Swiss-Prot record:
HAMAP family: Glycerol3P_GlpB
Cofactor or coenzyme needed: FMN
Entry protein name: Anaerobic glycerol-3-phosphate dehydrogenase subunit B
NCBIfam families: glycerol3P_GlpB (TIGR03378), PRK05329.1-2 (NF003719), PRK05329.1-3 (NF003720), PRK05329.1-4 (NF003721)
Source organism per UniProt: Haemophilus influenzae (strain 86-028NP)
SUPFAM superfamilies, per the entry: FAD/NAD(P)-binding domain
């Protein structure tokens, strides 16, 4: 099987890169092992939410993105943003904003500055882009609605309205609000309640999407809101897009917002579904449930890869993109004495002091502090080409969280790195 580009990994980075290449006429295949991290994400994308802390103290929140991305080069020279340069990072971020608008991902935000989004526990987290159905505030501006009702679903334990309501008013942007909490009684979900394992956001949305009792649900929301101007709901309404949520908003005449629940997350799944539909509609091929095993090299180039399901057939391509993610997606593997990338056996780097073969450098003694192993990943250059045995391979690129040299959890930049490197690599391949 021969392609122009073979992409390993079907998450945010892999799909974004594939779409950009397919739009320009390249023939791409994505080898997708299973659910990606985006399926468990909040739906909000972060470009850079916090600056690194050299003393493991509190990280400074980022508001002005350009200023802080530029400053990042001095503190983390191996960060993908530092290698690409602030100008290119912001340009690729803006390219993704345009792509998101084209795909109707319904995202709000800009590269000018971060906004605050409300979490499922009632705290605020910085974000670059958020679904327009999620409650957000800009800086210290007060939330525009004074009376808020936080409504859960009776018997659904992955969203706790009382806890959210109590925490919400502790934020300065919501201290003027009157926040109440309650539960929706939805009889159509009684069948799911018999098995707690099935009472999850995905199952709920699948049942409700048929709108068998849509008017009853509208009435229940209005009555439970008790005169509130805004209603916060768990993200359980609409599996593939926001149409169901929009219909509820129009019918109730209320400012309805949805909040991410415990994984799996509908907000993240919607984005992955829409990205995949776009990739396939452009003629891209998705090989689902398969995983890349190893590669064959010719000099400083990758000739082909082998996969688990296609044992007797090689996948050849002019260029290869490694978008396999970090430990969560098995893009990186840790054993007792080493951390490695399993397909190409690429060189591994991390933050200063990290050594992939010295387990004692992987962690620090305080559990809640940023851990050095979280910065592990493959080494790249300014073109995102992957390093192996000290040399950069000319037709192998890395995108997303498989890249090393930064801690995405600490800095709040995982999805930003994913889309920025994906679009940068697409440009590199198209320029050949």
């Amino acid at each position: 099987m021969n392609f122009d580009v073979a992409i390993i990994g079907g998450g945010l980075a892999g799909l974004t890169c594939g779409i950009a290449l397919q739009q320009c006429g390249k023939r791409c295949v994505i080898i997708n092992n299973g659910q990606a991290a985006i399926d468990f994400a909040s739906g909000s994308l972060d470009l850079l939410s916090r600056m690194p802390s050299t003393t493991y103290g509190e990280n400074r929140a980022v508001e002005n993105l350009k200023e802080n991305i530029t400053a990042l080069r001095n503190e983390l020279p191996a960060h993908p943003y530092s290698l690409l340069g602030a100008e290119k990072v912001l340009a690729k971020a803006q390219d993704f904003e345009r792509l998101a608008n084209e795909l109707n991902l319904d995202l709000i935000g800009s590269t000018e500055k971060n906004h605050w989004r409300v979490t499922g526990l009632g705290s605020l987290r910085g974000a670059w882009l958020s679904p327009n159905s999620v409650p957000t505030v800009q800086g210290n501006e007060p939330f525009p609605h004074k009376r808020i009702a936080v409504l859960g679903i009776e018997g659904y334990h992955d969203f706790q309205p009382q806890l959210l309501a109590a925490n919400l008013v502790l934020n300065p942007q919501f201290e003027h609000c009157e926040v109440t909490s309650g539960f929706l009684n939805i009889p159509q979900l009684d069948e799911l309640r018999k098995n707690a394992r099935e009472f999850r956001s995905v199952n709920i949305s699948q049942l409700l999407e048929h709108k068998l009792a849509f008017n009853d649900l509208v009435k229940e929301i209005i009555e439970s809101a008790q005169g509130a101007e805004a209603v916060f709901l768990p993200a359980c309404f609409g599996l593939e897009n926001q149409e169901f949520m929009t219909a509820l908003r129009d019918a109730t005449k209320l400012a309805l917002f949805e909040l991410p629940t415990l994984p799996p997350s509908l907000l993240g799944m919607r984005q992955r579904i829409q990205l995949r539909h776009k990739f396939e509609s452009l003629g891209g091929l998705m090989i689902n449930g398969d995983s890349a095993l190893n590669a064959t090299f010719e000099g400083n180039k990758v000739r082909c890869i082998n996969t688990r399901l296609l044992e007797n057939e090689e996948i050849t391509a002019d260029n290869f993109v490694l978008a396999s993610g970090s430990f969560f997606s098995k893009g990186l593997i840790s054993e007792f004495d080493k951390i490695y990338e399993p397909v190409f056996e690429s060189d591994i780097i991390g933050v200063e002091g990290f050594n992939q073969k010295d387990r004692f450098t992987w962690t620090v003694h305080r559990f809640a502090h940023p851990q050095p192993y979280q910065s592990a990943g493959v080494a790249i250059n300014a073109q995102c080409q992957v390093q192996k045995c000290g040399q950069f391979l000319t037709n192998l690129y890395a995108v997303g969280n498989v890249i090393g040299g930064f801690n995405a959890l600490e800095l709040g930049c995982g999805s930003g790195v994913a889309v920025v490197t994906a679009l940068a690599v697409a440009d590199e391949i198209l320029a050949k």
